[in-house]
């Protein structure tokens, strides 16, 4: 059984935001939506992210000790990591705010559209010679994407 048979009652997202430190664990969940909800909240909490071989599209953009605190995959260093954060409250607060800013920039609606824009533009450059459009095709004209990207994308 989990935690040696000890199971705590479920906690709502709103209740989670009362905690100073929030641990993101790999498993059967939706980590990207959880990041967006938790990090994008008005009450900053420091994210503690498990080192893992699993990933989301935005993980390469995140930097340890800038946007989150990294914890070993077996959580062997969790106590030491929390002690470090408690001993450095200014740094912990900065990491929490950096994580929140990261969400607003990359995981917001505009941020996700920019990510898709960059993917589609790369695909377009690769497939440009093979691309054909007929009267039955439904697409967003490239000029609209470029106008959007110019104003919104990083």
Predicted regions mapped to residue ranges:
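Catalytic binding pocket for nucleotide-activated donors in carbohydrate/polymer assembly enzymes
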Residues: 10-154
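Catalytic donor nucleotide-activated moiety binding site of glycosyltransferases and closely related
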Residues: 1-9
């Amino acid at each position: 059984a989990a935690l040696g048979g000890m199971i705590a009652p479920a906690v709502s997202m709103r209740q989670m935001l009362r905690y100073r430190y929030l641990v993101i664990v790999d498993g059967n969940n939706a980590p990207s939506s959880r990041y967006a909800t938790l990090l994008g909240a008005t009450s900053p909490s420091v994210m503690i992210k498990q080192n893992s071989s699993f990933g989301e599209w935005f993980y390469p953009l995140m930097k340890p000790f800038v946007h989150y605190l990294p914890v070993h995959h077996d959580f062997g260093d969790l106590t030491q990591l929390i002690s470090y954060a408690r001993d450095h409250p200014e740094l912990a607060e900065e990491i929490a705010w950096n994580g929140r800013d990261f969400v607003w920039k990359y995981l917001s609606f505009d941020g996700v559209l920019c990510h898709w824009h960059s993917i589609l533009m790369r695909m377009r450059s690769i497939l440009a010679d093979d691309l054909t459009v007929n009267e039955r095709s439904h697409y967003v004209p490239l000029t609209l994407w470029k106008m959007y990207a110019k104003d919104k994308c990083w």
